[in-house]
Curated annotation (Swiss-Prot):
Belongs to the thrombospondin family. GO terms for cellular component: collagen-containing extracellular matrix; extracellular region; perinuclear region of cytoplasm. It comes from Homo sapiens. SMART domains: EGF, EGF_CA, TSPN. GO terms for biological process: bone trabecula formation; cell-matrix adhesion; growth plate cartilage development; ossification involved in bone maturation. This is Thrombospondin-3. The lineage of its organism: Eukaryota, Metazoa, Chordata, Craniata, Vertebrata. Residues 316-354, 370-410, 414-456 form the EGF-like domain.
């Protein structure tokens, strides 16, 4: 008995201690912070704690669907949206991202890994900010009471000025701009206190962190040591109370016995107990009844799970309406009580969920996963010799595989004519091309030119043969090349002397050599030049105003430097809010003086139009938050969860084709019943198909209805892209600082299919404005000089000035002449690099591009030609690139004449999920990129199949 009394007193004493000790921490329920005055008070507490508290904790319980995420908690400035402190969950890559304002005014980001939170299950997360007021704070992440990740020695947090408090705003997962895409059950912020006390609040033993167990043990020993004397006194007093209590209980037992005897005597005399109000049970079936003195003499307990009411009357709760527990597309059936979900919709697999109550419905939502129909052993039901492409919740049957002809309706049959030398319609140095409608055409191989039926040697690989060919169709590519050794895919010949301008030392035939002629393409023997630029009056579009760039935006023959209306929209430059972009309506929604047509932030004022990362989104509205990695930030992406860099939206409904189930909005679904739509991009609700070939009449020969027939259309499934054209391009300078700054000078020829760079320049890019998903990109590369030995190449998947892939080639080994910030050594040989620069343009990226190898936070070398051979002067090379960003497939081939000299093989990398194309130079002049060709292509090549299996097995 004395041992039990001692244990009780000890427990009582410990409870008193912890109750008093918990008073030096503050617990704030963030989900209840609503009205402005209350938010200001809470913000002031947080600001003070950041300056004075030892630790600050964010404790939350929530549930996220797979691969989803969002902002968990954020403290922002309403005035300029300054991010003082923010914690968000990036479910797609299993991490928690913490960002805060540093003392130097920059935002610092901390990635906490091993945060598997987006799996449809409920998790408790504790984020500990240790020593926020110290010079080097630390962050600890606990997931379900286990230590997941930690970072110490972080940059100090910037103190929040007191004047900012009234303008602070607290956003949680339920109220943030990027909302948590799940359910937040609780969210508290704890100011001060130790991990032991916070662990008691969250009922966590904190596995994996022995320091916390030690803290609890030490605290207990400290309590016993300090309170020993008081404990003895309290136990003595407690024993006296127990003795008195025992005597009182004995007296009560005697009195109860007397009362019981009296009642028994009354029953003998004829007195009977009153009838129970709970018999029969007046409550709802299954609800407990309890006798009470108040009217009506009973009280009913709570309604059973799944029902609601006062206990007497209970009605069913519709879990389907209140919790939405079923997967989209799966019907929710409400029962009495409870609910159940029907089977996952077609194209998905998962469990059939059933249960009772809203809490259960919210915590046990149905999860359905996509089925890869194409790997069912039956090619998804498509023709065995056709291409099957898996999509989310469905699949689509594509064209016949290479070497087969036909379609899904008629079947894909072997194309014997293209694989039998005795019957092939193509030249021996040509290959077959298979069009969408099943037709076959021929194309000469690399190093050969002609119409495909007849091919001849093409030394400079510009698409024109060295000798004229006897073609029956009078194809222009059968005419003799007017520059045999220098690529000129446009065959320009200003003086019509049969020698192309690219290799004619007097291109205009005026008797003055090109190197001395101030009008190379216009005869002007007098060489008159009224202004101070390098162009004579005969060819100067501003003869009296110096303008070496000769830019003419509206193409009216009058250069921008002297044109009063540069864009030709009828509004003078001085009054035009977009002087270089036609916009006769002058719409300016944000009233910043820059019209919407040329405003990089049309809904946010940014009169300076600064765009530090050259992604065409102004710095003011550039969030750099891109969940799917396709180069478009989530706020502007028409499919924010699916990579679609092209942003194609055929029906202009604001939903990209990649995530739109009815691309043309004609009421016929693209792939699922009552579809598939036989003209997916062109409205045809009647689905008329006169020849029964599976392709509707309205898109028979022009699938995207862009007035360019499919065999000539470089993107047959996009009405926005028809021909290869780099006439409109963006210049990106990768080293914008320096005393000897020389920017590239780009000259575009052949209607945008040829680019020449004339200057020995700093690193720079010429980037087209068309963004691609999957793409085939090829061109001829030629250095038309013998005076230099530096870099040239091309780029793809350009997203901004710090994120793109580049294929680059150096002629000889060389150490870069500026050793700051690090020594960079270039090796000869073709290189494929993934640029993911943290700093962006500047000396770090400049040296990283020059260097052959990996450079932290700048460039990763994905592949280099093992031959380690540089390019040769005045020699033409042809590259072929295949990029399928949806699976990370990259392959680069390089030809010298008809000979394949380099092949990267299959490279798997998903750093950039699509983007724009362009060309690259670094300290190399007189580069020609000729006969440029790109083509949209999302079909995954067959050599990816081994990697697909490895990806599914987690080995790549």
């Amino acid at each position: 008995m004395e041992t039990q009394e001692l244990r009780g007193a000890l427990a009582l004493l410990l409870l008193c201690f912890f109750t008093s000790a918990s008073q030096d921490l503050q617990v704030i329920d963030l989900l209840t912070v609503g009205e402005s005055r209350q938010m200001v008070a809470v913000a002031e507490k947080i600001r003070t704690a950041l300056l004075t508290a030892g630790d600050i904790y964010l404790l939350s319980t929530f549930r996220l669907p797979p691969k989803q995420g969002g902002v968990l908690f954020g403290l922002y400035s309403r005035q300029d949206n300054t991010r003082w402190l923010e914690a968000s969950v990036v479910g797609k890559i299993n991490k928690v991202l913490v960002r805060y304002q540093r003392e130097d005014g920059k935002v610092h980001a901390v990635n906490l890994q091993q945060a598997g939170l987006a799996d449809g299950r409920t998790h408790t997360v504790l984020l500990r900010l240790r020593g926020p007021s110290r010079p080097s704070p630390a962050l600890h992440l606990y997931v379900d009471c286990k230590l997941g990740d930690q970072h110490a020695g972080l940059p100090a947090l910037a103190p929040i000025p007191p004047a900012e408090v009234d303008g602070l705003e607290i956003r949680t997962g339920q109220k943030a701009y990027l909302r948590m895409q799940g359910f937040v059950e609780s969210m508290k912020i704890i100011l001060g206190g130790s991990m032991a006390r916070v662990g008691a609040l969250s009922e966590c033993p904190f596995q994996g962190d022995e320091s916390i167990h030690s803290a609890v043990t030490n605290a207990l020993h400290s309590i016993l040591g300090e309170q020993t004397k008081a404990l003895v006194t309290q136990l003595t007093l407690f024993n006296q109370i127990l003795v008195e209590l025992r005597d009182d209980i004995r007296d009560q037992v005697k009195e109860m016995s007397l009362i019981r005897n009296t009642i028994m005597e009354c029953q003998v005399c004829g007195f009977h107990e009153q009838r129970s109000h709970c018999s029969p049970n007046p409550c709802f079936r299954g609800v407990d009844c309890m006798e009470v003195y108040e009217y009506p003499g009973y009280r009913c307990g709570p309604c059973p799970p799944g029902l609601q009411g006062n206990g007497t009357h209970c009605s069913d709760i519709n879990e389907c309406a209140h919790a939405d527990p079923c997967f989209p597309g799966s019907s929710c059936i409400n029962t009495m009580p409870g609910f159940h979900c029907e089977a996952c919709p077609r194209g998905y697999k998962g469990t059939q969920v059933s249960g009772v109550g809203i809490d259960y419905a919210r915590a046990s939502k149905q999860v359905c996963n996509d089925i890869d129909e194409c790997n069912d052993g039956n090619n998804g039901g498509c023709d065995p010799n056709s291409i099957c492409t898996n999509t989310v919740g469905s699949f689509k049957c594509g064209p016949c595989r290479l070497g087969f002809l036909g379609n899904q309706s008629q079947g894909c049959l072997p194309a014997r004519t293209c694989h039998s030398p005795a019957h092939s319609p193509c030249h021996i140095h040509a290959h077959c091309l298979f069009e969408r409608n099943g037709a076959v055409s021929c194309q000469c191989n690399v190093g050969w030119a002609g119409n495909g039926n007849v091919c001849g040697t093409d030394t400079d690989i510009d698409g024109y043969p060295d000798q004229a060919l006897p073609c029956m169709d009078n194809n222009k590519h059968c005419k003799q090349d007017n520059c045999l050794l220098t690529p000129n895919s446009g065959q320009e010949d200003a003086d019509n002397d049969g020698v192309g301008d690219q290799c004619d030392d007097d291109a205009d035939g005026d008797g003055i050599k090109n190197v001395e002629d101030n009008c190379r393409l216009f005869p002007n023997k007098d060489q008159q030049n009224s202004d101070t630029d390098s162009f004579g009056d005969a060819c100067d579009n501003c003869p009296n105003v110096p303008n070496n760039d000769q830019k003419d935006t509206d193409g009216n023959g009058e250069g921008d430097a002297c044109d009063n209306d540069v864009d030709g929209d009828g509004i003078p430059n001085g009054l035009d809010n977009c002087p270089k972009v036609p916009n006769p309506l002058q719409t300016d929604r944000d009233e910043d003086g820059v019209g919407d047509a040329c405003d990089s932030c049309p809904e946010m004022s940014n009169p300076t139009q600064t765009d530090a990362d050259s992604d065409l989104v102004g710095d003011v509205c550039d969030t750099n938050e891109d969940s799917d990695g396709d180069g478009h930030q989530d706020t502007k992406d028409n499919c924010p969860q699916l990579p679609n860099s092209s942003q194609l939206d055929s029906d202009n409904d604001g939903l990209g084709d990649e995530c739109d189930g009815d691309d043309d909005n004609d009421g016929i679904p693209d792939y699922v019943p009552p579809g598939p739509d036989n003209c997916r991009l062109v409205p045809n609700p009647n689905q008329k198909d006169s020849d029964g070939n599976g392709v509707g009449d309205v898109c028979e020969d022009d699938f995207d209805n862009d007035a360019v027939v499919d065999p000539l259309d470089v993107c047959p499934e996009s009405a926005e892209v028809t021909l290869t054209d780099f006439r409109a391009y963006q210049t990106v300078v990768l080293d914008p600082e320096g005393d000897a700054q020389i920017d590239p000078n780009w000259v575009v020829l052949n209607q945008g299919m040829e680019i020449v760079q004339t200057m020995n320049s700093d690193p720079g890019l010429a980037v087209g404005y068309t963004a691609f998903n999957g793409v085939d990109f090829e061109g001829t590369f030629h250095v038309n000089t013998v005076t230099d030995d530096d870099y040239a190449g091309f780029l793809f998947s350009y997203q901004d000035s710090g994120r793109f892939y580049v294929v680059m080639w150096k002629q000889t080994e060389q150490t870069y002449w500026q050793a700051t910030p690090f020594r960079a050594v270039a090796q000869p040989g073709l290189q494929l690099k993934a640029v993911t620069s943290v700093s962006g343009p500047g000396e770090h990226l400049r040296n990283a591009l020059w260097h052959t190898g990996h450079t932290p936070d700048q460039v990763r070398l994905l592949w280099t030609d093992p031959r380690n051979v540089g390019w040769r002067d005045k020699t033409s090379y042809r590259w072929q690139l295949l990029h399928r960003p949806q699976v990370g497939y990259i392959r680069v081939k390089l030809y010298e004449g008809p000979q394949l000299v380099a092949d990267s093989g299959v490279i798997i990398d998903t750093s950039m999920r699509g983007g724009r194309l362009g060309v690259f130079c670094f300290s190399q002049e007189n580069i020609i990129w000729s006969n440029l060709q790109y083509r949209c292509n999302d079909t995954v090549p067959e050599d990816f199949e081994p990697f697909r299996r490895q990806l599914l097995q987690g080995r790549v």
